Protein backbone atom coordinates (compact mmCIF):
# COMPACT_ATOMS: atom_id res chain seq x y z
CA UNK A 1 0.00 0.00 0.00
CA UNK A 2 2.77 2.44 0.92
CA UNK A 3 4.61 1.69 -2.34
CA UNK A 4 1.38 2.39 -4.23
CA UNK A 5 1.06 5.76 -2.49
CA UNK A 6 4.70 6.55 -3.27
CA UNK A 7 4.02 5.92 -6.96
CA UNK A 8 0.85 8.04 -6.93
CA UNK A 9 1.45 11.37 -5.13
CA UNK A 10 -2.04 12.68 -5.89
CA UNK A 11 -3.69 9.67 -4.25
CA UNK A 12 -1.24 9.94 -1.37
CA UNK A 13 -2.24 13.57 -0.91
CA UNK A 14 -5.98 12.94 -0.71
CA UNK A 15 -5.52 9.88 1.55
CA UNK A 16 -3.36 11.91 3.95
CA UNK A 17 -5.95 14.70 3.91
CA UNK A 18 -8.86 12.32 4.52
CA UNK A 19 -7.19 10.41 7.37
CA UNK A 20 -5.73 13.55 8.94
CA UNK A 21 -8.97 15.53 8.87
CA UNK A 22 -10.86 12.53 10.28
CA UNK A 23 -8.40 12.14 13.16
CA UNK A 24 -8.50 15.88 13.71
CA UNK A 25 -12.20 15.68 14.58
CA UNK A 26 -11.61 13.22 17.43
CA UNK A 27 -11.88 14.98 20.79
CA UNK A 28 -9.87 13.83 23.81
CA UNK A 29 -10.60 15.59 27.12
CA UNK A 30 -12.50 18.18 25.12
CA UNK A 31 -9.55 18.91 22.81
CA UNK A 32 -9.00 18.09 19.15
CA UNK A 33 -6.15 18.74 16.73
CA UNK A 34 -8.36 19.84 13.84
CA UNK A 35 -6.49 20.29 10.57
CA UNK A 36 -3.17 20.09 12.45
CA UNK A 37 -3.63 16.30 12.54
CA UNK A 38 -2.86 16.25 8.79
CA UNK A 39 0.75 17.16 9.61
CA UNK A 40 1.26 14.21 11.94
CA UNK A 41 -0.40 11.74 9.54
CA UNK A 42 1.87 13.00 6.74
CA UNK A 43 4.93 12.68 8.97
CA UNK A 44 4.05 9.10 10.02
CA UNK A 45 3.33 7.99 6.44
CA UNK A 46 6.50 9.52 4.99
CA UNK A 47 8.63 8.15 7.83
CA UNK A 48 7.27 4.67 7.08
CA UNK A 49 8.10 5.11 3.39
CA UNK A 50 10.43 7.98 2.55
CA UNK A 51 9.46 7.83 -1.14
CA UNK A 52 6.03 9.28 -0.32
CA UNK A 53 6.56 12.95 -1.07
CA UNK A 54 4.02 15.59 -2.09
CA UNK A 55 5.34 17.95 -4.81
CA UNK A 56 6.70 21.18 -3.34
CA UNK A 57 4.40 23.40 -5.41
CA UNK A 58 1.35 21.88 -3.67
CA UNK A 59 2.29 23.03 -0.18
CA UNK A 60 3.75 26.30 -1.42
CA UNK A 61 0.37 27.13 -2.95
CA UNK A 62 -1.41 25.86 0.16
CA UNK A 63 0.57 28.10 2.51
CA UNK A 64 0.14 31.09 0.19
CA UNK A 65 -3.65 30.58 0.09
CA UNK A 66 -3.89 30.16 3.85
CA UNK A 67 -1.87 33.19 4.92
CA UNK A 68 -3.37 35.40 2.19
CA UNK A 69 -6.96 34.93 3.39
CA UNK A 70 -5.79 35.29 7.01
CA UNK A 71 -4.35 38.64 5.96
CA UNK A 72 -7.58 39.62 4.18
CA UNK A 73 -9.60 38.93 7.33
CA UNK A 74 -7.19 40.68 9.67
CA UNK A 75 -6.37 43.59 7.33
CA UNK A 76 -9.20 45.99 8.27
CA UNK A 77 -8.26 45.85 11.97
CA UNK A 78 -4.51 45.33 11.56
CA UNK A 79 -3.41 48.90 10.93
CA UNK A 80 -5.68 50.45 13.56
CA UNK A 81 -4.52 47.83 16.08
CA UNK A 82 -0.90 48.44 15.09
CA UNK A 83 -1.24 52.09 16.02
CA UNK A 84 -2.65 51.09 19.43
CA UNK A 85 -0.45 48.18 20.47
CA UNK A 86 0.87 46.46 17.35
CA UNK A 87 4.13 48.40 17.57
CA UNK A 88 4.59 47.05 21.09
CA UNK A 89 4.11 43.51 19.80
CA UNK A 90 6.64 44.15 17.03
CA UNK A 91 9.27 45.31 19.54
CA UNK A 92 8.42 42.35 21.79
CA UNK A 93 8.82 39.97 18.85
CA UNK A 94 12.29 41.31 18.03
CA UNK A 95 13.38 41.02 21.67
CA UNK A 96 11.89 37.52 21.90
CA UNK A 97 13.74 36.33 18.79
CA UNK A 98 17.00 37.77 20.16
CA UNK A 99 16.39 35.89 23.43
CA UNK A 100 15.65 32.62 21.61
CA UNK A 101 18.77 32.98 19.46
CA UNK A 102 20.77 33.42 22.66
CA UNK A 103 19.09 30.36 24.21
CA UNK A 104 19.83 28.26 21.11
CA UNK A 105 23.48 29.38 21.15
CA UNK A 106 23.84 28.37 24.80
CA UNK A 107 22.21 24.96 24.19
CA UNK A 108 24.33 24.19 21.13
CA UNK A 109 27.59 25.23 22.79
CA UNK A 110 26.94 23.65 26.19
CA UNK A 111 25.75 20.33 24.72
CA UNK A 112 28.48 20.22 22.09
CA UNK A 113 26.01 20.00 19.21
CA UNK A 114 26.92 20.29 15.56
CA UNK A 115 26.58 23.91 14.39
CA UNK A 116 24.70 23.18 11.15
CA UNK A 117 22.33 20.61 12.68
CA UNK A 118 21.88 22.82 15.75
CA UNK A 119 20.91 25.79 13.62
CA UNK A 120 18.46 23.55 11.79
CA UNK A 121 17.11 22.55 15.21
CA UNK A 122 16.51 26.25 15.96
CA UNK A 123 14.55 26.74 12.73
CA UNK A 124 12.57 23.56 13.39
CA UNK A 125 11.78 24.63 16.95
CA UNK A 126 10.22 27.79 15.50
CA UNK A 127 8.92 25.90 12.41
CA UNK A 128 10.65 28.31 10.06
CA UNK A 129 10.97 26.60 6.69
CA UNK A 130 12.24 29.82 5.02
CA UNK A 131 14.76 30.22 7.84
CA UNK A 132 16.01 26.67 7.32
CA UNK A 133 16.24 27.26 3.56
CA UNK A 134 18.22 30.47 4.15
CA UNK A 135 20.71 28.60 6.36
CA UNK A 136 21.09 25.87 3.72
CA UNK A 137 21.83 28.54 1.11
CA UNK A 138 24.33 30.22 3.44
CA UNK A 139 26.14 26.94 4.17
CA UNK A 140 26.27 26.03 0.47
CA UNK A 141 28.41 29.12 -0.04
CA UNK A 142 30.76 28.06 2.80
CA UNK A 143 30.89 24.23 2.70
CA UNK A 144 28.46 22.50 0.30
CA UNK A 145 29.06 19.12 1.98
CA UNK A 146 27.24 20.37 5.10
CA UNK A 147 24.23 21.82 3.27
CA UNK A 148 21.90 18.91 4.11
CA UNK A 149 22.58 18.97 7.85
CA UNK A 150 20.21 21.84 8.80
CA UNK A 151 17.36 19.81 7.27
CA UNK A 152 18.08 17.00 9.76
CA UNK A 153 17.93 19.32 12.77
CA UNK A 154 14.79 20.95 11.38
CA UNK A 155 13.07 17.57 10.89
CA UNK A 156 13.89 16.47 14.44
CA UNK A 157 12.61 19.63 16.11
CA UNK A 158 9.57 20.32 13.91
CA UNK A 159 7.04 17.78 15.33
CA UNK A 160 7.83 18.76 18.91
CA UNK A 161 7.46 22.42 17.99
CA UNK A 162 3.91 21.94 16.77
CA UNK A 163 2.89 19.65 19.61
CA UNK A 164 4.67 21.72 22.28
CA UNK A 165 2.93 24.95 21.32
CA UNK A 166 -0.45 23.23 21.20
CA UNK A 167 0.12 21.67 24.65
CA UNK A 168 1.00 25.08 26.16
CA UNK A 169 -2.13 26.61 24.62
CA UNK A 170 -4.37 23.77 25.79
CA UNK A 171 -2.98 23.34 29.31
CA UNK A 172 -2.77 27.08 29.92
CA UNK A 173 -6.38 27.62 28.87
CA UNK A 174 -7.49 24.85 31.25
CA UNK A 175 -5.42 26.04 34.21
CA UNK A 176 -6.46 29.67 33.79
CA UNK A 177 -10.09 28.68 33.11
CA UNK A 178 -10.12 30.89 30.02
CA UNK A 179 -13.55 31.95 28.78
CA UNK A 180 -12.76 32.36 25.09
CA UNK A 181 -15.98 34.07 24.05
CA UNK A 182 -16.03 36.41 27.05
CA UNK A 183 -12.44 37.49 26.34
CA UNK A 184 -13.32 38.11 22.69
CA UNK A 185 -16.40 40.08 23.76
CA UNK A 186 -14.31 42.29 26.06
CA UNK A 187 -11.98 42.97 23.13
CA UNK A 188 -14.92 44.02 20.98
CA UNK A 189 -14.72 41.00 18.69
CA UNK A 190 -18.01 39.51 19.89
CA UNK A 191 -20.89 41.74 20.87
CA UNK A 192 -23.52 41.11 23.51
CA UNK A 193 -27.09 40.50 22.26
CA UNK A 194 -28.58 43.63 20.72
CA UNK A 195 -31.88 45.20 21.77
CA UNK A 196 -33.99 48.22 20.80
CA UNK A 197 -35.83 50.66 23.05
CA UNK A 198 -37.68 53.94 22.68
CA UNK A 199 -36.30 57.20 24.07
CA UNK A 200 -37.72 60.71 24.29
CA UNK A 201 -35.00 63.35 24.17
CA UNK A 202 -34.77 65.81 27.03
CA UNK A 203 -34.42 69.58 26.51
CA UNK A 204 -30.90 70.71 25.70
CA UNK A 205 -30.07 67.84 23.35
CA UNK A 206 -29.16 69.53 20.07
CA UNK A 207 -27.45 68.64 16.82
CA UNK A 208 -28.31 66.01 14.23
CA UNK A 209 -29.78 62.53 14.68
CA UNK A 210 -26.43 61.13 13.59
CA UNK A 211 -24.80 62.87 16.57
CA UNK A 212 -26.73 60.82 19.15
CA UNK A 213 -24.02 58.13 19.62
CA UNK A 214 -21.48 60.89 20.36
CA UNK A 215 -23.86 62.80 22.63
CA UNK A 216 -24.69 59.63 24.57
CA UNK A 217 -21.10 58.39 24.58
CA UNK A 218 -22.32 54.93 23.61
CA UNK A 219 -22.21 52.62 20.57
CA UNK A 220 -25.86 52.94 19.52
CA UNK A 221 -27.79 53.80 16.39
CA UNK A 222 -31.15 55.51 15.97
CA UNK A 223 -33.24 53.70 13.36
CA UNK A 224 -36.72 55.25 13.65
CA UNK A 225 -38.31 58.56 14.53
CA UNK A 226 -41.64 57.99 16.28
CA UNK A 227 -44.12 60.71 15.33
CA UNK A 228 -47.01 58.83 16.96
CA UNK A 229 -47.69 55.19 17.90
CA UNK A 230 -48.63 54.32 14.30
CA UNK A 231 -46.39 56.70 12.37
CA UNK A 232 -42.68 55.93 12.19
CA UNK A 233 -40.10 57.25 9.73
CA UNK A 234 -36.45 56.52 9.05
CA UNK A 235 -34.03 58.25 11.41
CA UNK A 236 -32.03 60.09 8.77
CA UNK A 237 -28.65 60.93 10.39
CA UNK A 238 -28.75 64.38 8.79
CA UNK A 239 -32.10 65.38 10.32
CA UNK A 240 -31.88 68.09 13.00
CA UNK A 241 -32.85 67.08 16.52
CA UNK A 242 -36.04 68.71 17.79
CA UNK A 243 -37.12 69.15 21.41
CA UNK A 244 -39.03 66.15 22.72
CA UNK A 245 -38.16 64.02 19.68
CA UNK A 246 -38.95 60.33 20.23
CA UNK A 247 -36.73 57.74 18.60
CA UNK A 248 -36.02 54.02 18.53
CA UNK A 249 -32.38 53.22 19.32
CA UNK A 250 -30.46 49.94 18.88
CA UNK A 251 -27.41 48.60 20.71
CA UNK A 252 -26.41 46.25 23.50
CA UNK A 253 -28.76 46.42 26.48
CA UNK A 254 -26.12 48.09 28.65
CA UNK A 255 -25.28 50.67 25.98
CA UNK A 256 -28.95 51.42 25.26
CA UNK A 257 -29.81 51.84 28.96
CA UNK A 258 -26.85 54.19 29.52
CA UNK A 259 -27.75 56.14 26.38
CA UNK A 260 -31.34 56.61 27.55
CA UNK A 261 -30.10 58.02 30.89
CA UNK A 262 -27.84 60.44 29.04
CA UNK A 263 -30.36 61.51 26.39
CA UNK A 264 -33.73 61.57 28.10
CA UNK A 265 -36.23 59.02 29.33
CA UNK A 266 -37.44 55.65 28.10
CA UNK A 267 -40.69 55.42 26.16
CA UNK A 268 -42.65 52.24 25.54
CA UNK A 269 -42.71 51.86 21.78
CA UNK A 270 -44.46 49.28 19.63
CA UNK A 271 -43.26 48.52 16.11
CA UNK A 272 -46.35 46.63 14.93
CA UNK A 273 -48.90 48.33 12.68
CA UNK A 274 -46.48 51.04 11.54
CA UNK A 275 -45.28 52.19 8.13
CA UNK A 276 -41.87 50.55 8.68
CA UNK A 277 -40.85 46.91 9.11
CA UNK A 278 -37.71 44.99 10.03
CA UNK A 279 -36.27 42.45 7.61
CA UNK A 280 -32.91 40.68 7.33
CA UNK A 281 -31.05 40.65 4.01
CA UNK A 282 -27.68 39.23 2.91
CA UNK A 283 -25.02 41.29 1.15
CA UNK A 284 -24.01 39.78 -2.18
CA UNK A 285 -23.69 42.87 -4.38
CA UNK A 286 -20.11 43.78 -5.40
CA UNK A 287 -21.19 47.44 -5.42
CA UNK A 288 -21.98 47.21 -1.70
CA UNK A 289 -19.30 44.83 -0.37
CA UNK A 290 -16.19 46.63 0.82
CA UNK A 291 -18.00 49.94 1.36
CA UNK A 292 -18.63 51.65 4.67
CA UNK A 293 -22.09 52.40 6.03
CA UNK A 294 -21.53 56.11 5.38
CA UNK A 295 -20.57 55.46 1.75
CA UNK A 296 -23.79 53.54 1.11
CA UNK A 297 -26.07 56.50 1.95
CA UNK A 298 -28.78 54.07 3.03
CA UNK A 299 -31.49 56.67 3.68
CA UNK A 300 -31.36 57.71 0.02
CA UNK A 301 -32.11 54.09 -0.84
CA UNK A 302 -35.03 53.94 1.55
CA UNK A 303 -33.68 51.99 4.52
CA UNK A 304 -31.64 52.14 7.73
CA UNK A 305 -29.24 49.49 8.98
CA UNK A 306 -30.14 48.43 12.52
CA UNK A 307 -27.70 45.54 12.97
CA UNK A 308 -25.00 43.74 11.03
CA UNK A 309 -24.28 40.05 11.58
CA UNK A 310 -20.71 39.23 10.56
CA UNK A 311 -19.87 35.57 11.00
CA UNK A 312 -21.38 34.69 14.38
CA UNK A 313 -21.27 38.22 15.80
CA UNK A 314 -23.84 41.01 15.64
CA UNK A 315 -22.55 44.57 15.64
CA UNK A 316 -24.10 48.00 15.86
CA UNK A 317 -23.34 49.85 12.61
CA UNK A 318 -21.21 52.97 12.73
CA UNK A 319 -20.50 55.30 9.80
CA UNK A 320 -17.07 53.69 9.31
CA UNK A 321 -18.27 50.08 9.68
CA UNK A 322 -17.27 48.11 6.57
CA UNK A 323 -19.95 45.98 4.91
CA UNK A 324 -18.56 42.67 3.62
CA UNK A 325 -19.81 39.90 1.39
CA UNK A 326 -22.22 37.50 3.18
CA UNK A 327 -22.93 39.96 6.02
CA UNK A 328 -26.54 39.58 7.14
CA UNK A 329 -28.06 43.00 7.65
CA UNK A 330 -31.19 43.80 9.62
CA UNK A 331 -32.79 46.80 7.95
CA UNK A 332 -35.67 49.13 8.73
CA UNK A 333 -37.63 49.76 5.54
CA UNK A 334 -41.08 50.60 4.23
CA UNK A 335 -42.89 47.43 3.03
CA UNK A 336 -43.23 48.84 -0.48
CA UNK A 337 -39.46 49.32 -0.84
CA UNK A 338 -38.26 45.89 0.34
CA UNK A 339 -37.75 44.65 -3.23
CA UNK A 340 -35.72 47.76 -4.10
CA UNK A 341 -33.49 47.35 -1.04
CA UNK A 342 -33.10 43.64 -1.76
CA UNK A 343 -31.83 44.45 -5.27
CA UNK A 344 -29.45 47.05 -3.86
CA UNK A 345 -27.86 44.70 -1.28
CA UNK A 346 -28.02 41.62 -3.51
CA UNK A 347 -29.55 39.10 -1.07
CA UNK A 348 -28.59 36.22 -3.36
CA UNK A 349 -27.14 32.95 -2.07
CA UNK A 350 -26.37 31.97 -5.66
CA UNK A 351 -24.23 35.08 -6.14
CA UNK A 352 -22.32 34.29 -2.95
CA UNK A 353 -21.75 30.73 -4.15
CA UNK A 354 -20.41 32.00 -7.50
CA UNK A 355 -17.26 33.45 -5.95
CA UNK A 356 -15.33 35.88 -8.14
CA UNK A 357 -11.85 34.34 -8.13
CA UNK A 358 -10.23 37.18 -10.09
CA UNK A 359 -9.41 39.32 -7.00
CA UNK A 360 -8.07 36.19 -5.26
CA UNK A 361 -5.80 35.37 -8.21
CA UNK A 362 -4.56 38.96 -8.48
CA UNK A 363 -3.98 39.23 -4.72
CA UNK A 364 -2.09 35.93 -4.57
CA UNK A 365 -0.01 36.95 -7.59
CA UNK A 366 0.94 40.23 -5.95
CA UNK A 367 1.80 38.43 -2.71
CA UNK A 368 3.95 35.78 -4.39
CA UNK A 369 5.75 38.44 -6.46
CA UNK A 370 6.40 40.41 -3.27
CA UNK A 371 7.70 37.25 -1.61
CA UNK A 372 10.08 36.58 -4.51
CA UNK A 373 11.85 39.95 -4.32
CA UNK A 374 15.45 39.34 -3.15
CA UNK A 375 16.50 41.49 -0.20
CA UNK A 376 20.30 41.94 0.04
CA UNK A 377 22.02 41.10 3.32
CA UNK A 378 25.52 41.83 4.62
CA UNK A 379 28.07 39.39 3.24
CA UNK A 380 26.62 39.25 -0.25
CA UNK A 381 23.71 36.92 0.59
CA UNK A 382 20.05 37.66 -0.02
CA UNK A 383 16.74 36.75 1.60
CA UNK A 384 13.12 36.94 0.53
CA UNK A 385 9.75 36.92 2.28
CA UNK A 386 8.89 33.72 0.44
CA UNK A 387 5.53 32.17 -0.31
CA UNK A 388 4.38 32.74 3.28
CA UNK A 389 5.53 36.27 4.08
CA UNK A 390 4.67 37.92 0.76
CA UNK A 391 1.03 36.78 0.55
CA UNK A 392 0.18 37.67 4.16
CA UNK A 393 1.54 41.20 3.70
CA UNK A 394 -0.42 41.53 0.44
CA UNK A 395 -3.52 40.21 2.22
CA UNK A 396 -3.16 42.69 5.08
CA UNK A 397 -2.80 45.64 2.70
CA UNK A 398 -5.59 44.60 0.32
CA UNK A 399 -7.86 43.68 3.23
CA UNK A 400 -7.36 47.17 4.64
CA UNK A 401 -8.01 48.75 1.22
CA UNK A 402 -11.25 46.72 0.94
CA UNK A 403 -11.71 47.50 -2.75
CA UNK A 404 -9.82 49.06 -5.64
CA UNK A 405 -12.00 50.38 -8.43
CA UNK A 406 -14.26 47.52 -9.56
CA UNK A 407 -12.27 44.90 -7.61
CA UNK A 408 -13.53 43.94 -4.15
CA UNK A 409 -10.71 42.23 -2.27
CA UNK A 410 -12.86 40.85 0.54
CA UNK A 411 -14.44 37.42 0.07
CA UNK A 412 -17.67 35.86 1.35
CA UNK A 413 -17.24 34.47 4.87
CA UNK A 414 -17.79 30.84 3.86
CA UNK A 415 -15.46 31.08 0.86
CA UNK A 416 -12.77 32.64 3.05
CA UNK A 417 -12.98 29.82 5.60
CA UNK A 418 -13.06 27.10 2.92
CA UNK A 419 -9.99 28.42 1.09
CA UNK A 420 -8.20 28.90 4.41
CA UNK A 421 -8.83 25.31 5.54
CA UNK A 422 -7.98 23.83 2.13
CA UNK A 423 -4.75 25.81 1.87
CA UNK A 424 -3.74 24.84 5.41
CA UNK A 425 -4.40 21.14 4.79
CA UNK A 426 -2.37 21.16 1.55
CA UNK A 427 0.54 22.87 3.28
CA UNK A 428 0.57 20.48 6.25
CA UNK A 429 0.37 17.40 4.03
CA UNK A 430 3.28 18.62 1.92
CA UNK A 431 5.59 19.81 4.67
CA UNK A 432 4.91 16.66 6.69
CA UNK A 433 5.99 14.33 3.87
CA UNK A 434 9.05 16.47 3.08
CA UNK A 435 10.33 16.00 6.64
CA UNK A 436 9.85 12.23 6.72
CA UNK A 437 13.17 11.16 5.18
CA UNK A 438 15.34 13.26 7.47
CA UNK A 439 13.24 12.33 10.48
CA UNK A 440 13.55 8.59 9.79
CA UNK A 441 17.33 8.77 9.30
CA UNK A 442 17.80 10.78 12.46
CA UNK A 443 15.73 8.39 14.59
CA UNK A 444 18.34 5.65 14.08
CA UNK A 445 20.93 7.85 15.86
CA UNK A 446 20.60 8.04 19.65
CA UNK A 447 22.01 11.58 19.65
CA UNK A 448 18.89 12.68 17.77
CA UNK A 449 17.06 12.73 21.10
CA UNK A 450 19.29 15.61 22.23
CA UNK A 451 18.29 17.67 19.21
CA UNK A 452 14.63 16.81 19.74
CA UNK A 453 14.87 17.84 23.41
CA UNK A 454 16.81 21.01 22.59
CA UNK A 455 14.23 22.02 20.01
CA UNK A 456 11.42 21.39 22.48
CA UNK A 457 13.13 23.61 25.08
CA UNK A 458 13.27 26.48 22.56
CA UNK A 459 9.63 25.93 21.57
CA UNK A 460 8.37 25.86 25.15
CA UNK A 461 10.45 28.91 26.07
CA UNK A 462 8.94 30.80 23.14
CA UNK A 463 5.34 29.87 23.99
CA UNK A 464 5.72 30.48 27.73
CA UNK A 465 7.41 33.87 27.24
CA UNK A 466 4.56 34.88 24.92
CA UNK A 467 2.06 33.79 27.56
CA UNK A 468 3.72 35.44 30.56
CA UNK A 469 4.88 38.70 28.96
CA UNK A 470 1.86 38.88 26.67
CA UNK A 471 -0.66 38.64 29.49
CA UNK A 472 1.08 40.37 32.38
CA UNK A 473 3.16 43.02 30.59
CA UNK A 474 1.38 43.70 27.30
CA UNK A 475 -2.07 43.06 28.83
CA UNK A 476 -3.21 40.67 26.10
CA UNK A 477 -5.98 38.13 26.53
CA UNK A 478 -4.86 34.50 26.64
CA UNK A 479 -6.07 33.70 23.12
CA UNK A 480 -4.32 36.73 21.62
CA UNK A 481 -1.12 35.88 23.52
CA UNK A 482 -1.28 32.35 22.09
CA UNK A 483 -1.93 33.88 18.67
CA UNK A 484 1.32 35.80 19.13
CA UNK A 485 3.00 32.50 20.08
CA UNK A 486 1.61 30.92 16.91
CA UNK A 487 2.79 33.94 14.93
CA UNK A 488 6.26 33.50 16.42
CA UNK A 489 6.38 30.02 14.91
CA UNK A 490 4.54 31.23 11.76
CA UNK A 491 2.98 27.77 11.83
CA UNK A 492 -0.55 27.43 10.39
CA UNK A 493 -1.17 24.20 12.32
CA UNK A 494 -1.01 26.02 15.65
CA UNK A 495 -3.30 28.89 14.66
CA UNK A 496 -5.70 26.34 13.16
CA UNK A 497 -5.83 24.52 16.49
CA UNK A 498 -6.43 27.78 18.36
CA UNK A 499 -9.23 28.84 16.02
CA UNK A 500 -10.90 25.46 16.41
CA UNK A 501 -10.74 25.57 20.20
CA UNK A 502 -11.67 29.20 20.77
CA UNK A 503 -14.32 29.76 18.10
CA UNK A 504 -13.26 33.43 17.85
CA UNK A 505 -10.83 35.52 15.78
CA UNK A 506 -8.88 36.83 18.78
CA UNK A 507 -5.93 34.49 18.19
CA UNK A 508 -5.90 35.48 14.50
CA UNK A 509 -5.39 39.11 15.50
CA UNK A 510 -2.22 38.33 17.44
CA UNK A 511 -1.02 35.92 14.74
CA UNK A 512 -1.40 38.40 11.87
CA UNK A 513 0.11 41.29 13.84
CA UNK A 514 3.46 39.60 14.48
CA UNK A 515 3.65 37.20 11.50
CA UNK A 516 5.57 39.51 9.09
CA UNK A 517 8.09 40.52 11.76
CA UNK A 518 8.54 36.92 12.91
CA UNK A 519 8.94 35.64 9.35
CA UNK A 520 11.69 38.12 8.48
CA UNK A 521 13.29 37.99 11.93
CA UNK A 522 13.69 34.20 11.87
CA UNK A 523 15.23 34.22 8.39
CA UNK A 524 17.84 36.73 9.55
CA UNK A 525 18.16 35.24 13.03
CA UNK A 526 18.89 31.70 11.83
CA UNK A 527 21.76 32.93 9.66
CA UNK A 528 23.12 35.10 12.47
CA UNK A 529 23.01 32.11 14.85
CA UNK A 530 25.02 29.93 12.46
CA UNK A 531 27.62 32.65 11.93
CA UNK A 532 27.94 33.10 15.72
CA UNK A 533 28.63 29.38 16.14
Swiss-Prot record:
Subcellular location: Cell membrane
Residue ranges crossing the lipid bilayer per the database entry: 4-23, 28-47, 57-79, 86-108, 151-173, 352-374, 379-401, 422-444, 454-476
GO biological processes: potassium ion transport
Entry keywords, A to Z: Cell membrane, Membrane, Transmembrane, Transmembrane helix, Transport
UniProt-listed InterPro entries: AAE_transporter, RCK_C, RCK_C_sf, YidE_YbjL
Residues in RCK C-terminal domain copies: 263-347
Protein origin, superkingdom: Bacteria
Signal peptide: none
Record-level GO cellular component terms: plasma membrane
Name this polypeptide is given: Uncharacterized transporter Cgl0590/cg0683
